[in-house]
Amino acid sequence: MSNFIVLGSSSSAEWDAYLNQLETKDIYFSSAFFRLFEDGEHQQAELFVFKQGDQLIVYPYLLRSISHLPAVIQLGLEGDWYDISTPYGYGGPISNLPPGAERSELYQQFSETFTDYCREKKIMTEFVRFHPLIGNATEYQSGLTTEWNRNTIYIDLTVGSESELIRHYGSNHKRNIHKLKSAPFTIRNSNLKDRIESFSELYYGTLNDLQADSFYYFPKKFIEDTSHLLEGRVELFEAMDGEKTVATSIVLHERPWMHYHLCGWDRAYLQWSPTKLLIHAAAKWGMENGFECFHLGGGYKGNDDLFQFKHRFATQLEPLDYYLGKRIFFPELYERIISFCDTRISGNYFPLYRHPDLDMICIPSEEIGPNGERSFA
């Protein structure tokens, strides 16, 4: 008898019922959040549920078709092939067991079962963005290459008062927030549904200013869907100069945690640093509404200036560790696939055949050997 089931997002009630059996859960694991990333064609959400009696491990991910990619077509693989990835945010497998030998054994059994499932399903690769607050990277390692990516920062919301909240800030942040409170700025907690255009304008403008990777350019429909699918679990905080929005942030939440999810600002107001007041107001709101932690995330690359900016909101707390996990289920086929790509790129991108700068130019058919290998003659 099978000890696992696989659910799609259409089984949202059952999906979320399994999450409710966990002591620790987060909005990034919810069926509603995963529905944001489904495209109806090449990408669908799945929840892998592994059960041993009352013991449980759940693992939500995106099942993504690779059969339509030029290099895969050129290789002539039969049937449907896929890879899996956790979406933007944090994820990985989580269990209802407390830390200890019993949970470690359950993860080992889960890993073996999940590996067999992936190979049978023709899943080429797996990419995991582990959850810094849960720390599940240390549990799920069998067959996986796990690497530290960066530190992330969180604000402790259990301190009891606004003055205690501010006491944990760096001296520069304290001064700026005090000045901003007496400046002509106000903070508004708005309904995202009513502010799609305003948020999008500042968000995309900020990405352009930062010359951000294409990965972060979520379409406007994604923002609209966020307002609908996550209703009741999404807040929009805006820093206002009169009726003009000068900084804005989407905060996602599911008790006990909040996440600083997407943000934007008007570069003309950067000298005022209104984002500091925005983050402080969101933290104060979270504290007043019974949340325990406000996760700010990390920098763009390592412990850069953005990381330092966030760290000054939590100077008395140790940063968290953010890990990535990578696995190739069919190594020989993977190497053959990427050999059919125009690989004039470098770096550690995984899986390589999805690199956004990859031309994906297939090798001409006359360069393909009788066994599907690339001929370099």
Model-assigned labels for residue ranges:
Residues 18, 28, 33, 88-90, ...:
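Aromatic side chains
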Residues 60-62, 99-111, 116, 175-186, ...:
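A broadly tuned preference for mixed-charge, low-complexity surface segments
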Residues 39-43, 87, 93-103, 161-165, ...:
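Low-complexity, flexible helical/coil segments
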Residues 69-145, 255-318:
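Acyl-donor binding region in acyl/amide transferases
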Residues 63-67, 133, 141-163, 289-377:
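Active-site/acyl-donor-binding loops of N-acyltransferases
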Residues 1-6, 10-14, 49-54, 97, ...:
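Solvent-exposed, well-ordered amphipathic alpha-helical segments
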Residues 15, 43-45, 285, 313, ...:
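Tryptophan-centered motif/residue detector
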Residues 2-74, 131-271:
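A conserved beta-strand-loop-helix scaffold within acyl/acetyltransferase catalytic domains
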